[in-house]
Every structure is written in C-alpha cells, then in structure tokens.
Amino acid sequence: MIDFSNLESYTENNRIEVKKAQGTLPNSIWETYSSFANTLGGIILLGVAETKNKSLVPIGLSDPEKLIKDFWYIINNQNKININILTSSDVFIQEINGKSIVVINVPRAQRFYKPVYINGNPVSGTYRRNGEGDYHVNNEELKEMYREANVKAQDIMIIEAMDTSLLCSDSINSYRQRMKLSRPGHIWEGLSDEVFLMKLGAAGIGADGKIHPTAAGLLMFGYESDIVRKFPNYFLDYREDYDNSTRWTDRIQSSSGDWSGNVYDFYFRVYNKLQQDIKVPFKLEGNMRIDDTPVHMAIREALANCIINADYYGRQGLVVIKTKDSILLSNPGDFRIELDAAKSGGYSDPRNSTLMKMFNLIDIGERAGSGIPSIYYIWEKQGLNEPYFRQSFEPNRITLVLPITKDDDKKSAIKIGDKKSAIKSAKIDRIIEYLTDHAEAKASELAEYSGLKASRVRDYLKFLVEEGTVTAEGSNRNRIYKLKS
C-alpha cells in the first residue's frame, strides 16, 4: 500500500493511476479497472493530480461519498462492467493534508474471471497495463485469457483429426520402461500400448467412437511435424551460451528433424546437458554410490515445471539457456496463481495437468504445489544466489532464473565454464515490491529491506535499469531508484 504521508514522492506507473475526478467519475476509470484486473493489479487514486515533474499531489474531492456511491452502482452494472472483483474494503476515503481522496485497490483477477472488460464487448473493452498506461489487448491475448479461464486443463482435449499411430513408438517404449523402474509391478505394466495410453490420459475415445491422442499425448509422445499441426507456435529450444563471441556453443531444437521433437524426449536431452556440470560429492548407500543431489532434484523440478506450465499456443516457444552464470527457463503463458502463493507452496494450478500426471508417474515433478518452494529451499541451503522469476506481457511469458554463483563468490555447488561471478540474480521481486510501495529508494534502503549487501543490490539495480524496469536519478550516494513510469 502507498505511504500517503509521502504521496508527492510517487509517480504513475504500471501499478498506480491517478484521476482528478472533479465532480464526477472519469470514464477512463473503467479502462484502468480492466487493465489492472487483467494484469498485476494496482491502485487508482481519485482526487489526485500529476504535476509537470510527474510527482503526485492531492487536490481533494468535494463529495467523495457520492463518487464512491456512483462507483459501486456502475461497477455492479453488467452492461458496463462484466464482473466486479472488488470487496467493500478495496474502496475507501483517505485524508491527506486536510484533503479527501478516494482509494480504489484493484486486485489481479483470478484466471476464472478473465477477461475483465467494459461496455459489454470483450473485443473492444478488454485492457491490460504496461509501463506506458492502459492498452487494448490484441486478439492473441484475448484468446489466451479465455483458454486460461476454462476449468478443464488445456491438454485433456481429444484430437480427432489424428490417431495414435502418429505417436513416436520409441518415446512410448522409453516412457514405459522408466515407469516400470519407478513403479515395478504397476497394474498397467501388461496393457497394450493403446490401452496404456488411454489409462495415462495420452489418448481417449472421440465422438466417432475411435481412439485418438489427447493434446497431452501428442505433446508428450508425438513428432514435431504433427505437433505443430495442432500447436502452430510449438517450439522447444535449448542453448548453451558460454562464449560471448559466438551465438551459442551447443543447441537442441524441436524442429531440427533428427529426433522426435516432443516434450518427453526434450526433457531428458536437456536434463542430461544441465546436470553434466553439477558437482557430486562422494556418498555411499550400502555399497552403491549415490550420484543424485538436492541440486539435481531442483533442476529436474524446474525443468518439469517449465514444460508442464507452458502455454503451447503461445508465441516464442519454450526456451532453456545455460550460461556460466545461470540456468534460464522460459515458457509462454501467464502465472495462473499469485507468485507469492506459488513460492509459499501448498496450492497448485498447472496449465497442463495431464502432462504433470505423466511426469509424476516416472517420479519427475512435485504435486500439491511444493515444487517451487523446494527449488528456493535447495538453492538457499547450497548458499547460491536466490532464484527469481521475471514476468512479461505482449506476449505473456514467465522466466525462471537459477543463478549458479554465491554472494561471496566462493566455490559453487555447480561449476560451469570459467569462474566469473554472476550479478544478474537476487531478490528481484522484493526490490520491485519495495519500489512499488515506496515510490523511490536508495540502494542502502533496498539492501536493508532485502538483507543483501548494498554492493550486491546495486548490481541487481543495474540489471533492472538495463532491462528497463527501473530508472535511476542522481549520482553516487544520492542516487535514487524508481519503477519506470
């Protein structure tokens, strides 16, 4: 929440919008309501103006109670707004220096309620928010919102235009062998491939009474050439970028044509690359050496999470990049739950629940929302810099960065390439959170808030400035940082 005693230090940004609202509600308030609800949430301030230098100043409202009454009347009119996601505590009067303003706290809408639109028309009335203000969503973003709102998982759909003979038998045989090792004596062991695929959720009976692959079955066991017929934007990409003088040093692409190109085979090809540089301490269990470590488990979880939660209709594909400083896993799609809830664990809303079930049956991936918390816990126990997420829009995209260096630059649990330390990692979310609530801050304040050294925080701030998320003003000890408005 905003520090109202220090309102002049704030500027409009992707989470704050001000309206003068003198005498009546401005029509643009509903565009902002829609944009905040469909993006990350935000705060609308009525009775506040923006000065020439972009700072905020209260100008007050003559009758704030009437504005609130009008606001509730309109927001509950479905001809104007398709859904009201606010509660009574989200709208209130705030006194600042003897002036009354109205505060409207708009939460991020749950996926079941999106799109939040105005004037009865989702095509022309759906908005989102970026650093430059409210904007009309494009057709691709609107379609994604409707897909996400569906209670059924995307990957359970039966694809009647294809039959199971199109699936890769080598991938199916490999999966069945892994499941036999993970779950010896399982009741499905003796089933034919076709019946096994139906039990697994990889195939189902269509309206024509015949057996066809599901979307999950096609993604898991299909060939890339068939997958792109259903998911035109489907693309899997793994790169190793160790040398700045070359574009990449190793690469795996689903479209290369020399392997199946499905997500099952991609997972194991990529995991084998990622785990090659993990240092394994000498440990025996009985007479057998144990080569698995918590870091191995965390990387498996992160890779599975990326595959399971990707929106395969989305643009730019699924990308995994390994550098000497970090492992980056990026997938198309928006967060389906709040990031803080995902980090806390206990709740899961996977985009592709059938894919999750398939990986779970071969002991890959966690259930009950424990995957992301376990990644953070393992990274902390190893003394590595904290993982962080980046979320972007137009198109929607989630990126998880796993730093593989330590704050003190001591020898890492993972050694990749040379020993050059990484700086593009840390508590990015906490820095952005603090700047949202406090409008501006010095590196020393952010260091105290995040528990990191000031020098480390300055490195992260430099990264955020280069990325365009944060702006810096002043020099040396007087330098302050703000979210880009």
Describe these PLM feature segments.
Residues 465-474:
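A short, conserved structural fragment
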Residues 424-441:
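Short amphipathic alpha-helical interface segments
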Residues 447:
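The alpha-helix within a helix-turn-helix
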Residues 421-427, 475-485:
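Short, cationic-aromatic polyanion-contact patches
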Residues 1-296, 301-406, 443, 452, ...:
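Conserved N-terminal catalytic/coupling substructures associated with nucleotide/phosphate chemistry
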